Amino acid sequence: MSRITGINGRIIYNSRGSKTIEVDITSDEEFLGRVCAPSGASVGKYEAASFPNNGPEESLALLKNNSDKFIGSDPTDLKSIHDIIRTIDDTENYSKIGGACAFAITIAATESAARLQNVPFYKIINPNGDLKFPFPIGNILGGGAHAGPGTPDIQEILIASTGAKTIHDAIDMNLQVHKELRNTIQKNDPTFTNGRGDEGGWAPKYDNEKALEISATAIENLGFTLGKEVSLGVDFASSTQWDEQKAKYIYSRAGFENDPGEQIDFAADIIEKYKLTYAEDAVHE
């Protein structure tokens, strides 16, 4: 049986310029898995803590102080890797080691196992499952916590090239729409300065409806059928709109409020009107 023979970590910077952690796991002295951990801009209160209170440095110190616990483990046995992590941190929300570090350890072990066995990564996770083509999701328009004042309340408008036959075509189609959306916004608003949110989506001064309309227009300008060749998605990030005292969703930029029932109708209308293939966090928590 193969064994983990080395584990290490380091502090790196993510695309927002914030510190995160990267973990290396080596199996049988040769097969390296390396993973850097993501973390979101808007998080829920039930979500695993990305890092302990003192940040990724505390995660890294805990990893290094407990690295010997992983040595000799089978990298293909994800349950055993998880169990080791839980001996280090038994808190409900990973507040000691951080969910980001736990994620990086688990996926680095899986990547190391895949290289060890010379199989694709997914074969380690699900060796006997049906294969389906994954559609990469691209962020084309940002609002909410990802962009500045005047942008939409909803956090992201995304696309998936659901008509693509290959990963190359899917990425190419996503990029085409991203570029066309900039052109479409510029024609609609000559004052647009090509501003972007922190994940690369364009950040125009539009309300929710206008942002969705112009995103759909950009898709159709390229000759694609909305909901067929290219589909829209929305990350509502509704917890950022939720007001606990009022028990309502406050859309301050658009100038309206939703009670919980109205919020469900609001999201359902967008899903139906724009033929969404993807909807994230449409309600609080």
For the regions a language model picked out, list residue spans one by one.
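Short, Gly/Pro- and small/polar-rich lid/capping loops
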Residues: 1-20
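Short beta-strand elements
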Residues: 11, 21-29, 33-39, 138-161, ...
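Glycine/serine-rich anion-binding loops at beta->alpha junctions
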Residues: 14-15, 90-107, 136-149, 197
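Metal- or metallocofactor-binding catalytic centers and their adjacent structured scaffolds
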Residues: 38-119, 171
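Mobile "lid/hinge" segments at catalytic clefts and subdomain interfaces of large enzymes
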Residues: 131-197
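Hydrophobic faces of well-ordered beta-strands that scaffold small-molecule active sites
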Residues: 136-141, 194-204, 228-234, 279-280
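Catalytic core of soluble alpha/beta enzymes
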Residues: 191, 209-285
